[in-house]
Each structure stands twice: as C-alpha cells, then as structure tokens.
Amino acid sequence: MNLHEYQAKQIFAQYRLPVSKGIVCHSLDDAVSAIHTLAGDTWAAKCQVHAGGRGKAGGVKLVRSEAEIREFCNQWLGQRLVTFQTDKNGQPVNTIYLEETCLIERELYLGAVIDRSSQKIVFMASNAGGMNIEDVAAQTPELIHKATIDPLTGAQAFQGRELAFKLGLSGDQIKQFAHLFVQLAKLFIEKDLALLEVNPLVLTKQGQLLCLDAKMVIDSNALYRHPELKALQDPSQEDAREADAAKWDLNYVALDGNIGCMVNGAGLAMGTMDIVKLHGGRPANFLDVGGGATKERVSEAFKLILSDQNVKAVLVNIFGGIVRCDLIAEGIIAAVNEVGINIPVIVRLEGTNAELGREILANSGLRLIAANTLTQAAQLAVKAAEGK
C-alpha cells in the first residue's frame, strides 16, 4: 500500500527525522491560508498522487505569492496528473501539500528495500539525488553505495557513518546522517515496509540534512497489524478494478493492452503474458485466480476482465493442479451468461478434470474457441484481438 508524501513525512516526524514544515491543503482556501501560516516568501506546492515524476509533469512548483498559489490550485485540484509512472488517465489530485523551502547545497539519495536473495534490508545511498535511481543504477552503478541490515542486530550507527564518508559528508553532517540512517531502518522494520525512499535528501546551505521528499510503500500482507496505517489508504489513487479484485482474493493488475488474461498461478500468468507478447499481442491485465479458485471467483474474474473497454479478446489459460478445470469451465459459462459477451474467448485447459472441463464448454452452446497448447492459445488470442 502506498502513502502520500505528506503522510510519509508525518510518520518521519514521529521518528525524529528532519522534514520541512508543511500544511495539507484540500481546497483553495486551505492553500491561501497556509501561505500566511508558513515561514518565508517562497513555498513548494506539491500535488499529492501515488506516482513519481510529478515535477516533470508540472505537479510540483515553487510559488511566491497568493496569486501563484491560486493559479496552481485552480490548475490541479480536482484534475488528474499524468506522469511517466501513471497510465494515460493519470491520478486524481485531491490534495496539495504546501511546505517551506530551503537553500540547497547538495542533493543526495537514500532508499531501502528488501533484498530477497539475502533476505535482508538493503540501504542504498548516492550523490545522484533528485534523479531516477533506476537510471543511475543502470548507467553509473559505481555511484550507488549499499549497506545491508542484519535482522538480528538491526541497523548500526557505524554503517551510517560509512555511507556518510562515501557520500563525502564531513563533521556534524556524518553524525546527522548516522542518526537518520538508524531511524529510517527502525521505521522500515516497525512499520513493515516494502520500500522506503528519500529522494532527494538534501544538505542545506546551513549544513543540515533534510528529507525533501518521502516515499513509503507498506507490505499489504502486514496491514492487519497496522490499523493506523490502513486508515491512511487513499482508494481514489487505486484502480477500481484492482480494489474489486481484492475483495474476491484475486490478484489483478490493470495494463494497457487489449487481450484479457485469466490464469491460475502467478508464474503461469507471467508466462502467459510473455507468450502473448512474443506473438505480437498486448496483455490487458495480469490476473491470477489462485490455486483455490471457486466457480464464483472465476465468474467475478471474468466480469472484471470484461469491464475493461479496451479488451478485444480474452485468453483463459488454466492448468488444473489444485484448481479443477470443470469448476473453471462452469465459472466461465456463468460469467458469460450473466455479463453477455461479444468478443472472442480462447480457452486452454490442462490438468485435473481437463477433459470434463472441455466437454462442459463444448456443450454450453457458447462461442468459445478451444486451444490445445499455450502457443496455439496465444496465437489465436492475438489474431482475435486484431479482428482476424
């Protein structure tokens, strides 16, 4: 689950991490009032959306007067912000965060993720702050310095000092960085995070480190023990179809293609998408109905796919290990009868009760296209989506 920048910074403050003073604005009146409360004569106005690239898209701007903040709010509040991380529709801007500014000497990067190979938290620091860290890692990997957190001992101050030295910090800056490093690691563990990012972490002209931006992604599987974080969830930033899928324990991710995919098992779902792409098609979604799929869940999954107006064909690829192919077949028939369908549906069934499943589909009287192999299914789906 993603948090907004202002929410992450509120949590940062609880952990004694340095952040600028800011005010959350839900309306134009809030913003006008905020600039008379905040110090200074220049403020940063930031659209609050669950996506990066806000600055390049015009969603972050320095404002110096009431007229400028009015213009910014009128431009964005109630509108949608499109960045390189969103789809073509963008994300709704319901909130603007207005905060005090500072004079910047240097921009750094500091982030943490779970390294699955070592099963430990890995911190990454770089002098290339304010940039896309993926680009830095690909083009100049030598600029990224790492520190691994042992889960038994936790983050140690000496690790923070080592990173500070590598970043070229000196004097009191090293002490500041070590404190920041230890507190961020504590936050990461206590809040069950999947990702934590401060980009940029700035060194001000006064020699102080300041978290100018904050990104937190919480492990959704751990939300049951963090009701205070669950309460921060913003449904408006989530795809409505993905939210509906979660109600049925379906793993769904919307994409921008035109071939709907329904598969059981995450690995098989990824492989299905790959082979569709290999044959020139574009998957419209990732959808894993899971190993314990019921007829009702399959029916809901099918309706979910058909709710996407871009879908021109549907590919159902089921390998019956835990799930039975005859149940999948009944779910498909129920969904088609309930929703109605005028696009081609290609079905490939293998495994437990596959023959029975194919027989049920064949006797349904519906216009379903049977495929014997995954390759054949992908080829048929691509042709069907192209209207051939």
From Swiss-Prot:
Signal peptide: none annotated. Substrate binds at residues 264, 321-323. GO terms for cellular component: cytosol; succinate-CoA ligase complex. PROSITE patterns: SUCCINYL_COA_LIG_3. Its cofactor is Mg(2+). Mg(2+) binds at residues 199, 213. It comes from the Bacteria. Gene3D superfamilies: ATP-grasp fold, A domain, ATP-grasp fold, B domain, Succinyl-CoA synthetase domains. Heterotetramer of two alpha and two beta subunits. This is Succinate--CoA ligase [ADP-forming] subunit beta.
